[in-house]
Amino acid sequence: MKNYKVAIIGATGLVGRTFLKVLKERNFPVEKLYLYASANSAGKKIEFNGTEYTVMELKDENIANDIDIALFSAGGGVSLEYAPKFKAKGAVVIDNSSAWRMDKNIPLVVPEANPEALKNHPGIIANPNCSTIQVMPVLKVLQEKYGLKRVIYSTYQAVAGSGQKGLNDLEANLKGESSKGYPHQIAFNTLPHIDVFLDNGYTKEEEKMINETRKILNLPDLKVTAT
């Protein structure tokens, strides 16, 4: 079995640490590990498989030349700037942000639904929104067996998805205090408002699900709505 030199961009964040956890749980054959983060996190120590690694600042001169796989979870702006640079050094980039998802030249992949999209990939591979990922294996089977005419999504997202400010609002509401980040009380409530509202009436997060579903299933005219 081949061993791989792996880089994690955004290594000190929640998703970056989850990358490390999954690599360890699955005994992924990591020969060498590179950890990258912002200047504020550079120098931190992270243990992996009994070895302590020092987090490097993400900048051009620190990009190693021998990386096989680069796992990105550092936001869309970072991915747009640095994914091509890692690719140019020979790495295959797997990006967790929304930066490349709708690029017509970049495959958007859920392995259980469209693994064939990985053939002849250009060196950057996108994975979709978490809400889209979990439903794709089911929709793929339904499409193959019966065909899809329309998809209606209703998703209920955790407050944690809006970050620390959202959690602060939840805690404040539970104490009888007003929200500062949310436009209305979030405790014991559901708000049809995730990310910004667009001109078409959908929110940005809802539109992601619509567009990603069509691309992954290769059904550009599929009727999809999401709330």
Where are the regions that the model predicts?
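N-terminal Rossmann-like NAD(P) cofactor-binding subdomain of oxidoreductases
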Residues: 1-186, 218-223
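Oxyanion-binding "anion nests"
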Residues: 189-227
